[in-house]
UniProtKB/Swiss-Prot annotation:
Molecular function terms, GO-annotated: cobalt-precorrin-5B C1-methyltransferase activity
Protein name: Cobalt-precorrin-5B C(1)-methyltransferase
Keywords (A to Z) from UniProt: Cobalamin biosynthesis, Methyltransferase, S-adenosyl-L-methionine, Transferase
Coiled coil stretches, renumbered: none
Entry EC number(s): 2.1.1.195
UniProt similarity note: Belongs to the CbiD family.
Disordered: annotated span: 353-376
Catalytic activity: Co-precorrin-5B + S-adenosyl-L-methionine = Co-precorrin-6A + S-adenosyl-L-homocysteine
Pathway this chain belongs to: Cofactor biosynthesis; adenosylcobalamin biosynthesis; cob(II)yrinate a,c-diamide from sirohydrochlorin (anaerobic route): step 6/10
Entries under InterPro entries matching the protein: CbiD, CbiD_sf
GO terms for biological process, alphabetical: anaerobic cobalamin biosynthetic process; methylation
Length: 376
C-alpha cells in the first residue's frame, strides 16, 4: 500500500502477537527453552516470525511476550506488550483461555463470545490453538492467560466500554495482519455495536458521526448507552449491516458538514472522500426560499458551517432541507421499509439545526442535490 509515494508497512494484530507469545511459552514449558525467533501460522497460511520481548520460566508456568508492531497504521495498541502465560491443564480439559491484566472480560450479549469470557476473539483463539498443537501435538491440555501491559489505559481509547468489554482491550484479528489506515476495524466495531444493541433489547439505535452529535442526539431521545453507535464517517457501513441485522428504528446524527455530504449522496463522509459542494448547497438554499444574494454568499462561504450561518441570518432553514435530502440518501442505502429512519443535523455546539420525522424508509428516486456531489 502506498500514500504520497511512500510504501506503508503492514503490521500484526494483537491476535497474531498473542499466538506467537503463546507458542514460545508453551515450548519453554515443555522443553525448558524459549524458541528464537518464534513463527506462527496466519489464516492465509503465511508464517511470520517474531522476536521475544520478555521470557520467564517458573515451576508450573512459562511466560513470553511480543511487542505489537502495527506497521504504519495509527493503531492505539502499537508498541503494546502482549504476554502469554501457559500452564498445564487438567487431563481432557483441552485448551482454555483466561484474561490476564489488561485484557477485557465480555459482560454483554451480542458479541462473538458469551458474557464472562475473556475478550480473545474466535480467530485469535484458533491461531493460539494451532500454535500450541504445533509444539505439543493434538489433544493438548493447557491453560492460556493473555495479558497486555497498560491494557486498561489503552482500552479507554477504544469502544470496548461501549460494547460491554471491561477491564482491558480485546485480542483481535481476522487475517492476523494490520493494513495501514484500513477502515475495517472501525466498521467491525460498528457491527459489534449493533449486535450488542439488538442482543440487549434495543429497538432504536442512534448512529453518530462524532462526540458532539452523539451527546446532542442522546439529549433528544434519552437512549441507553448500548443504543449509541459510534459510526464515525462510515454511514454506509452501518446502514448496510442494518439491512440484514435490523432494528425497528435508526437515527443518524451528525454535524452540518457531514450531513451535507450525506445529503449529496456520500455514504462515507470522511474529508478524503470529497468535500461538501457549496454550489449544490446554494441551490438548496434557493429551493428553501433564499434569494440570489444568499446563493452568491453561500458559494463564497469558507465552509459549510459558514453557509448555514448565512442562511440562518436571513431566515432560511437550510438545516431542514439538508436533513430531508440526507434522509433520501440514507433510505436508499437502507433499502427496507421495515426500519423507521430519521436524521438529526447539529452545529459544532450541539444545537439542532435540522431534523426529519421518523418515517419508514424506502427506496426513493435519487435526489437532484445528490447528483452534484463530486466537487473537490
Amino acid at each position: 500500500m502506498e500514500t504520497d509515494g511512500k510504501t506503508l508497512r503492514r503490521g500484526w494484530t494483537t491476535g497474531t502477537c498473542a499466538a506467537a507469545a503463546t507458542k514460545a511459552a508453551c515450548a519453554a514449558l515443555l522443553t525448558g527453552e524459549f524458541p528464537y525467533p518464534v513463527d506462527v501460522e496466519l489464516p492465509s497460511g503465511a508464517r511470520p516470525a517474531f522476536s521475544l520481548a520478555t521470557e520467564e520460566k517458573g515451576e508450573n508456568f512459562a511466560r513470553a511476550g511480543v511487542v505489537k508492531d502495527a506497521g504504519d497504521d495509527p493503531d492505539v495498541t502499537h508498541g503494546a506488550l502482549i504476554e502469554s502465560t501457559v500452564r498445564r491443564g487438567e487431563p481432557g480439559s483441552g485448551i482454555t483461555f483466561r484474561a490476564g491484566k489488561g485484557v477485557g472480560i465480555i459482560t454483554r450479549p451480542g458479541l462473538p463470545l458469551p458474557p464472562g469470557e475473556p475478550a480473545i476473539n474466535p480467530v485469535p483463539r484458533r491461531m493460539i490453538e494451532t500454535a500450541i498443537r504445533e509444539v505439543a501435538g493434538e489433544n493438548a491440555d493447557f491453560e492460556v492467560e493473555i495479558s497486555v501491559r497498560d491494557g486498561e489505559k489503552l482500552a479507554e481509547k477504544t469502544l470496548n466500554g461501549r460494547l460491554g468489554i471491561l477491564g482491558g482491550i480485546s485480542i483481535l484479528g481476522t487475517t492476523g495482519v494490520v493494513i495501514p489506515f484500513s477502515c475495517s476495524a472501525w466498521i467491525h466495531s460498528i457491527w459489534r455495536g449493533i449486535d450488542v444493541a439488538r442482543a440487549t433489547g434495543c429497538t432504536h439505535v442512534l448512529g453518530a458521526t462524532g462526540n458532539t452529535s452523539e451527546k446532542a442526539g442522546q439529549a433528544v431521545y434519552d437512549l441507553p448507552e448500548t443504543a449509541l453507535i459510534d459510526m464515525g464517517d462510515f454511514i454506509g457501513g452501518m446502514l448496510k449491516y442494518l439491512r440484514s441485522h435490523p432494528v425497528e428504528r435508526v437515527t443518524i446524527a451528525g454535524g452540518v458538514a457531514k450531513m451535507t455530504k450525506l445529503a449529496q449522496g456520500m455514504l462515507d463522509v470522511h474529508s478524503k472522500k470529497g468535500l461538501a459542494d457549496l454550489e449544490a448547497l446554494a441551490v438548496l438554499a434557493a429551493e428553501a426560499g433564499g434569494d440570489d444574494n444568499l446563493a452568491v454568499a453561500i458559494r463564497q462561504a469558507n465552509m459549510v458551517a459558514h453557509a448555514f450561518q448565512l442562511a440562518e441570518s436571513v431566515g432560511i432553514d437550510l438545516g431542514a432541507v439538508v436533513a430531508e435530502k440526507a434522509w433520501v440518501t440514507a433510505a436508499a442505502a437502507l433499502k427496507t421499509p421495515a426500519i423507521a429512519l430519521d436524521i438529526l443535523v447539529f452545529d459544532r455546539q450541539g444545537a439542532l439545526k435540522g431534523r426529519t420525522t421518523s418515517t419508514p424508509s424506502h427506496q426513493p428516486a435519487p435526489s437532484s442535490f445528490g447528483d452534484r456531489n463530486r466537487r473537490t
